[in-house]
Amino acid sequence: MKKYQRLAEQIREQIASGVWQPGDRLPSLREQVASSGMSFMTVGHAYQLLESQGRIIARPQSGYYVAPHPVCRSVATAAHVIRDEAVDINTYIFEMLQASRDTSVVPFASAFPDPRLFPLPQLNRSLAQVSKTATAMSVIENLPPGNAELRYAIARRYAQQGITVSPDEIVITAGALEALNLSLQAVTAPGDWVVVENPCFYGALQALERLRLKALSIPTDVKEGIDLMALEQALQEYPVKACWLMTNSQNPLGFTLSAEKKALLVALLTHHNVTLIEDDVYSELYFGREKPLPAKAWDRDDTVLHCSSFSKCLVPGFRIGWVAGGSHARQIQRLQLMSTLSTSSPMQLALVDYLSTRRYDAHLRRLRRQLAERKQQAWQTLLRHLPAEVKIHHNDSGYFLWLELPEQLDAGELSAKALEHLISIAPGKMFSTSGAWTRFFRFNTAWHWGEREEQAVKQLGSLIREMLSAKSLV
């Protein structure tokens, strides 16, 4: 029996004997580490095992409690591999982004949803309305930390999920990427180590390159997410200052971390005094009944800088994002003043006007339904036209699919061939510091599906079959 299993059995016996009653709060992870002498992750896995058995439950920002009734849950398993890598992003990413801008190219490589899914007429009316009433003072009023009404509106949306965030700690930014970059800059210095997922969003790698930071890439599973055992190993071996992670609808894999894993993640980083920069731009694009909580929901020690935006769920062109910066909010404001000065005043005012109409949630419900339908349609189309050797990794949120080619094929080569036919895909090496994931590519399912898209998938299937035939002759 392993250590975490012995600890779980010990706690289970204590619950059975009445030492801990239903509803009782168990010792925190840190308290259990101190009393048992075991490692943080050993204790974390013991609690996770008990939770999977339905014997305890995790409550955001509160801790672990003895459950009144057993609830069956699954426990994540992961590999134990870690590597440290210097960051060097080549021009390949920029070439792919340029291809995505060409309207003659089928945009399966795009990171954005179909703009026709957004309520652009209503947003344009809001923009026209505020342009009529804007004054010279509007620019001053919308300097960092940003428009007060917009910050209050965002704070209220946190409150709807039971998360207390003061409007005063929210900084409005020019999209989520600025929020993430400013957050990273606020808690690191050149040469510091930063943890990223492997694979991860290429914007994170570009930010690390620009700020001359060093990356630790942690193995990340397409279903279960980041390997917490490997993360703990990295935190023990390297002086890590920050973690840049996606916890909901991760790009490019598409997974959403379980509530149990989010709780363990925050507790682990808090234990090691490492800041989590949470990239949560896809959190509204869930397909289930309830919106998944961000890791921020388990933050009681100012560990998490939560970053999001309206770009992926409402209006990309406005470039309005934010960070719930906690004690770092003032430093983030200062950094913003020294770089972009402030976020567009008319865009902030237009968003305030639109959000006041209460149409936002109705739009989100419609958007989620359309994205789910398009993802299902794309998946079925890919199954019909791609060779059986291609594996399609599917998650029930967001609008990305992660495709895996057979061993001998290279997605970069497929991408180059596809571009000759005006089809773009996002090869896996865009999402790694080392150029790994060469057999994988990300596929955007959010665009309108018609004859053009159907023929493009057929062409991809033909190209893959040609590559397989060529390899078999070697």
Where are these regions (language model features)?
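Conserved core segment of the aminotransferase class I/II
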Residues: 123, 300-369
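N-terminal small-domain helix-loop-helix segment of the aminotransferase-like
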Residues: 82-175, 182, 356, 424, ...
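Conserved core of the PLP fold type I
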Residues: 137-272, 284-298, 371, 461, ...
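Short, conserved active-site loop motifs that form the nucleotide-linked donor/cofactor pocket
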Residues: 274, 304, 390, 423
